[in-house]
């Protein structure tokens, strides 16, 4: 939860950063969809979803095995009023009398499908419909509601930009964009929200989106699979035996002469020690060496502690000698 003291410190920090930032665009780009962003992934496993979900999902995932796994840099914070929902869209949402009607208009504006077509679209629709309900409860104007929805969309884009954990970076980006709409410093920031409205909006986003941050990342990003390969130094490289192409002929020959092939197999196994045995002996030798060093170190520590203890006991066993008293004062 953001306190007024922390908000003041964040405000000063954002002001200093905005002084050195480039000039913002006065007319931001508008997009019909709130979450149509292409996200780059490397060799990852996609979530299980139907083909309809893959086509109608607002978040597009590019399957590029050579892409970089590191998270992309977050964009510079800027004013996002009328960025995605323009004045005509906000008037249509304002005319909606019921929640169901508002959800239908919102799904049409964002080009989202129903829950039966895509679960991701249903999650996005719930996210922004609850945000609109919160804005109505707080009495936000059309400009404030549009900016709040755009802020939430930019935060969602930053969340799904990578499958790795970036909650701290997303929170810093969220607070920076939030203060771009709370401080009058054109063209970098405007005083669109009051202090109480900023705190209320920050508490709402923290208690809703950031509380379920990992769930959003799990749904909208692919799962990452990590493959490890270990190589031991000082060992011979393993050579894979070629597979037998004619299995039927080999089984027939083994059935014909079982007694002749068994001694040959035993002799070959005795002559060529397996790589597993070599690895086991090497590991045992290294473990024994480390254990001997550890045992020697423990013995030295025990000897030192015994010597210190014996010295203390000897000092305690000595008789206590009183310091020599000064001679009596001479009689007058």
Curated annotation (Swiss-Prot):
Keywords: Cell projection, Cilium, Coiled coil, Cytoplasm, Cytoplasmic vesicle, Flagellum
Location of this chain's protein in the cell: Cell projection, Cilium, Flagellum; Cytoplasmic vesicle, Secretory vesicle, Acrosome; Cytoplasm
Tissues in which the UniProt entry reports expression: Specifically expressed in testis (at protein level).
Protein name as annotated: Cilia- and flagella-associated protein 119
Source organism: Rattus norvegicus
Keyword rRNA-binding: no
Coiled-coil zones: 287-308
Disordered: annotated segments: 1-70, 246-271, 308-332
Lineage of origin: Eukaryota, Metazoa, Chordata, Craniata, Vertebrata
Listed Polar residues bias regions: 1-10, 49-58
GO BP: gene expression; single fertilization; sperm flagellum assembly
The gene coding this protein: Cfap119
């Amino acid at each position: 939860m953001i306190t007024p003291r922390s908000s003041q410190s964040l405000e000063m920090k954002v002001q200093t950063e905005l002084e050195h930032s480039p000039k913002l665009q006065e007319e931001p780009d508008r997009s019909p969809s709130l979450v149509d962003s292409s996200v780059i992934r490397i060799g990852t496993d996609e979530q299980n979803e139907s083909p309809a979900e893959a086509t109608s999902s607002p978040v597009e995932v590019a399957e590029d095995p050579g892409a970089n796994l590191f998270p992309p840099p977050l964009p510079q914070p800027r004013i996002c009023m009328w960025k995605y929902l323009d004045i005509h869209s906000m008037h249509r949402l304002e005319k909606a009398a019921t929640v169901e009607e508002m959800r239908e208009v919102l799904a049409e504006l964002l080009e989202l499908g129903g829950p039966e077509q895509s679960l991701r679209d249903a999650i996005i629709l719930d996210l922004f419909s609850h945000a609109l309900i919160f804005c109505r409860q707080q009495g936000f104007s059309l400009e404030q509601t549009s900016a709040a929805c755009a802020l939430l969309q930019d935060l969602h884009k930053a969340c799904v930009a990578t499958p790795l954990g970036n909650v701290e970076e997303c929170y810093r980006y969220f607070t920076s964009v939030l203060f771009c709409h709370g401080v009058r410093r054109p063209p970098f920031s405007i005083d669109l929200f009051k202090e109480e409205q900023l705190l209320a909006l920050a508490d709402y986003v923290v208690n809703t989106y950031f509380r379920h941050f990992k769930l959003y990342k799990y749904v909208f990003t692919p799962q990452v699979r990590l493959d490890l390969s270990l190589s031991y130094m000082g060992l011979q490289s393993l050579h894979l035996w070629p597979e037998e192409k004619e299995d039927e002929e080999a089984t027939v020959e083994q059935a014909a002469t079982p007694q002749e092939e068994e001694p040959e197999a035993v002799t070959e196994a005795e002559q060529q020690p397996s790589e597993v045995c070599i690895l086991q002996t090497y590991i045992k030798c290294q473990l024994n060496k480390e254990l001997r060093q550890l045992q020697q170190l423990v013995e030295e520590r025990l000897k030192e502690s015994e010597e210190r203890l014996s010295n203390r006991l000897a000092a305690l066993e000595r008789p206590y000698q009183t310091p020599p008293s000064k001679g009596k004062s001479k009689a007058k």
